């Protein structure tokens, strides 16, 4: 379905409810620049470097796009998805079933999730929705539960520290969304709904959190304006 949720002024803060779940795939493909290309980059990289029967857990898996892509690349992967939205998980499970894929899903608040050890954790556009006081604790849990030589892939919307640059990057991002078919009204309405819900950090703040969690080797593997993907390795 086409995302037309913000053609009217929002009556509540943004949440991943049934209305969002029904249009999520269209929404994210039109709202996150190079979403599919970045998903495929990360998936192909993991498929290339991970050993047989590696375990991958997507934290904030939404509609399972990344897990489904991985499952079709490598049949040996053990795949898990966690999300706090029952509506999003309903979509994820339906898609996985339609493709005949064996993916285990868990409905849970990530800050209260009973973590298990994995070779890879993925947090694509997830941390930005976690309340700031809880983010470091969550990253600490991720690091703790990664197996030796484990990997974290983390994609985030980011802030620029320079106010002038930040203003112009935000305007360019709005231009991008207009080119994807969103009106100025829809863009403004969604921004209003996301205020104090999606709270981005700067690149430096994200790197500091990763380092504090214990990661020593951290690289940026994708960036477009105010979107960036980091890969971090556990020793």
Swiss-Prot record:
The keyword Transferase applies. This is Carboxy-S-adenosyl-L-methionine synthase. One of its GO terms (biological process) is tRNA wobble uridine modification. InterPro entries: CmoA, Methyltransf_25, SAM-dependent_MTases_sf. Keywords: S-adenosyl-L-methionine, Transferase. Pfam families: Methyltransf_25. Belongs to the class I-like SAM-binding methyltransferase superfamily. Cx-SAM synthase family. Catalyzes the conversion of S-adenosyl-L-methionine (SAM) to carboxy-S-adenosyl-L-methionine (Cx-SAM). The keyword ATP-binding does not apply.
């Amino acid at each position: 379905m086409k995302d037309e949720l913000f053609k009217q002024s929002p009556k509540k803060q943004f949440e991943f409810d049934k209305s969002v779940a029904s249009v999520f795939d269209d929404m994210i493909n039109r709202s996150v620049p190079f979403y599919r290309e970045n998903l495929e980059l990360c998936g192909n990289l993991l498929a290339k470097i991970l050993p047989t029967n590696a375990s991958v857990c997507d934290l904030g898996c939404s509609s399972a796009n990344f897990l489904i892509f991985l499952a079709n690349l490598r049949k040996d992967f053990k795949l898990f998805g966690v999300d706090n939205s029952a509506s999003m998980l309903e979509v994820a499970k339906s898609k996985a079933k339609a493709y005949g894929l064996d993916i285990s899903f868990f409905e849970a608040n990530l800050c209260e999730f009973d973590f298990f050890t994995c070779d890879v954790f993925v947090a694509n556009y997830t941390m930005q929705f976690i309340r700031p006081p809880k983010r470091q604790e969550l990253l600490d849990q991720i690091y703790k539960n990664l197996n030796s030589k484990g990997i974290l892939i983390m994609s985030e919307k980011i802030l620029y520290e320079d106010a002038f640059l930040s203003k112009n990057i935000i305007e360019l991002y709005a231009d991008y969304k207009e080119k994807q078919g969103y009106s100025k009204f829809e863009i403004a309405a969604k921004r209003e709904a996301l205020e104090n819900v999606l709270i981005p950090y700067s690149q430096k703040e994200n790197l500091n959190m990763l380092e504090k969690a214990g990661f020593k080797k951290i690289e940026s593997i994708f960036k477009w304006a105010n979107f960036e993907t980091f890969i971090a390795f556990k020793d």
